[in-house]
C-alpha cells in the first residue's frame, strides 16, 4: 500500500505553532511582534545576498562589494558578517542568541541611517524566553523557501494570519483596529494613488502604504512617484511599520518617534494628495476640554 503523502503545513501555521511553544514567556498578542522582527532579519539577508552576488559578478563593481552605498542605492541594507542570517542562525541554540540578535540590530542601524530607531533592540532579551524554545522558532524561519518577489506576500500573509488567529480584528481596549486586507485593497482602488503624497495619521504597521505601492505596481507605475507620510502612537506598531516599509524598499516619513496624531501632529505643514486611514473610532477621552481648541485642524 502506497504511503499517504504528508500534507504540507502552510508557513504561517508553522510559525504560529512554533510561537505556541513560547507560551508562558510571551503573550499571544505579542506573537506577531516576535515573528516579524525575525522575518526582517531573514528577508534583509536574502536581499543583501542577491545584491552582493550581483556586485561580485561584475568586474567593475566587485571591488565595491563591501561598500554600503552600492546596496542602499538599490534599497538594500548593507550587512556586516554579524548581521547576516547564517551567523545569527548558527547561534540559535546557544545562550547568547539574544545578544547576537541585538548586535545585529545595532549594527544594522549604524550602517543604514534609514533604520535608526526602527529596530527592536533589547526586545527579545527582555522577553526572557528559554533559548531552547526560541530556537524552534528560528528553525521554522530558517526552513522558509520563497522567492524575493514573494517577500511582500509572505509578510502580509503572516501578519494577517496572526492577527486574525488571535481576533485582534475585534475592538480592543485601546481603540485599535486591524483593517482587513480586502478593505484596504478596495480603498486604494477607489482613490487610485498613482502618484503624489499618501498620508495615514494612524498607520499601524503600514498596511495602507503597502497596498498603495502594490496598486502602483499593478498598473505599471513607478513607486518613486508616491511619497509616504504617516504617524503611529503605539511604539511597537511604529517600529513594525518602519520595518515593514523598509524591507519592501519603500521610503517614508513616519516622524522621528511614535506620537498621538490627535495631540502631537508630526506633519503640521503637510498638504497630502491622498489620505488613507482607519481611525480608532471607539477611542474615548482622547482629549481634555481645553486641548486642541486652538489647533487649526479642528477649526471651522
Regions found by a protein language model. Give the residues of each.
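Non-catalytic, mostly N-terminal accessory regions of nucleic-acid modification and defense proteins
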Residues: 1-194, 253-266
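Intrinsic disorder/low-complexity signal
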Residues: 11, 294-295
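Conserved S-adenosyl-L-methionine
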Residues: 173-277, 282-292, 298
Amino acid at each position: 500500500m502506497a504511503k499517504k503523502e504528508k500534507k504540507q503545513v502552510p508557513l504561517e501555521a508553522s510559525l504560529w505553532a512554533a510561537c505556541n511553544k513560547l507560551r508562558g514567556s510571551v503573550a499571544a498578542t505579542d506573537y506577531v511582534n516576535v515573528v516579524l522582527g525575525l522575518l526582517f532579519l531573514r528577508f534583509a539577508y536574502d536581499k543583501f545576498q542577491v545584491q552582493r552576488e550581483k556586485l561580485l559578478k561584475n568586474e567593475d563593481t566587485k571591488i565595491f562589494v563591501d561598500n554600503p552605498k552600492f546596496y542602499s542605492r538599490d534599497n538594500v541594507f548593507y550587512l556586516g558578517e554579524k548581521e547576516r542570517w547564517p551567523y545569527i542562525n548558527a547561534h540559535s541554540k546557544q545562550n547568547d542568541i539574544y545578544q547576537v540578535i541585538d548586535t545585529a540590530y545595532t549594527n544594522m542601524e549604524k550602517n543604514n541611517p534609514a533604520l535608526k530607531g526602527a529596530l527592536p533592540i533589547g526586545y527579545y532579551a527582555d522577553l526572557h524566553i528559554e533559548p531552547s524554545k526560541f530556537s524552534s522558532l528560528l528553525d521554522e524561519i530558517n526552513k522558509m523557501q520563497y522567492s524575493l518577489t514573494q517577500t511582500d506576500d509572505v509578510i502580509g500573509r503572516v501578519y494577517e494570519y496572526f492577527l486574525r488567529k488571535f481576533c485582534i480584528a475585534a475592538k480592543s481596549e485601546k481603540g485599535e483596529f486591524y483593517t482587513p486586507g480586502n478593505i484596504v485593497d478596495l480603498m486604494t482602488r477607489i482613490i487610485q494613488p498613482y502618484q503624489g503624497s499618501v498620508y495615514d495619521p494612524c498607520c499601524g504597521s503600514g498596511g495602507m502604504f503597502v497596498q498603495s505601492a502594490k496598486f502602483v505596481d499593478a498598473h505599471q507605475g513607478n513607486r518613486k512617484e508616491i511619497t509616504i507620510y504617516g504617524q503611529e502612537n503605539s511604539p511597537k506598531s511604529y517600529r513594525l511599520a518602519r520595518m515593514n516599509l523598509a524591507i519592501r524598499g519603500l521610503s517614508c516619513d513616519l516622524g522621528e518617534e511614535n506620537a498621538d496624531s490627535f495631540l502631537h501632529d508630526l506633519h503640521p505643514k503637510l498638504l497630502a494628495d491622498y489620505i488613507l486611514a482607519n481611525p480608532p473610532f471607539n477611542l474615548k477621552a482622547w482629549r481634555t476640554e481645553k486641548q486642541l481648541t486652538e489647533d487649526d485642524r479642528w477649526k471651522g
